[in-house]
Amino acid sequence: MPIVLLGFMGVGKTTTAHLLNLPVYDMDHIIEERIGMPIADYFSLEGEASFRQLETEVLKGLLDLPSNCIVSTGGGVIKSEVNRELLLANREDNVLLTASFEVSYQRIRKDRQSQRPLFLQCSKEEFEALYRERMALYQGLADTVIDTDKLIPEQVARKILCK
């Protein structure tokens, strides 16, 4: 099974994945290719439930990949109970990247390339509630947990390669 990077928005999953010198399968990019539009647009047109169903289909396919690759998940992949069950079965190969709420919030705010629909729709307080809800769902899904608050992406990548 592949190494699967989990974590809330802004913890560095995509950035770190590309530093590991292995083939990278970014779930958000795969989904955008499949739907032919940015996720934010799909969210607006089809709603979150439709997006999560598509996300589950993509996750199932990616978990069947060989062990010499990286899967970078979307920040909300754990919202689906089906996805959490799939990830739990893969927990020894999962790496949970964490960051404090404030660090995640500032990283997302500064990221001009990614328009994250849930971030754009929420006040800071609502976004913090979302962060806390999702962090609780991540618990137990990965044997390896790395706090990225004070690490640069290269340090995070080294920790993953040494696991």
From Swiss-Prot:
The gene is aroK. Keywords: Amino-acid biosynthesis, Aromatic amino acid biosynthesis, ATP-binding, Cytoplasm, Kinase, Magnesium, Metal-binding, Nucleotide-binding, Transferase. Pathway: Metabolic intermediate biosynthesis; chorismate biosynthesis; chorismate from D-erythrose 4-phosphate and phosphoenolpyruvate: step 5/7. Catalyzes the specific phosphorylation of the 3-hydroxyl group of shikimic acid using ATP as a cosubstrate. Mg(2+) binds at residue 14. It comes from Streptococcus suis (strain 05ZYH33). ATP binds at residues 10-15, 116. PANTHER family: SHIKIMATE KINASE, SHIKIMATE KINASE 1, CHLOROPLASTIC. This is Shikimate kinase. Monomer. GO terms for molecular function: ATP binding; magnesium ion binding; shikimate kinase activity. One of its GO terms (biological process) is chorismate biosynthetic process. Signal peptide: none annotated. It comes from the Bacteria. It catalyses: shikimate + ATP = 3-phosphoshikimate + ADP + H(+). Substrate binds at residues 28, 52, 75, 134. Its cofactor is Mg(2+). InterPro entries: P-loop_NTPase (IPR027417), Shikimate/glucono_kinase (IPR031322), Shikimate_kinase/TSH1 (IPR000623), Shikimate_kinase_CS (IPR023000).
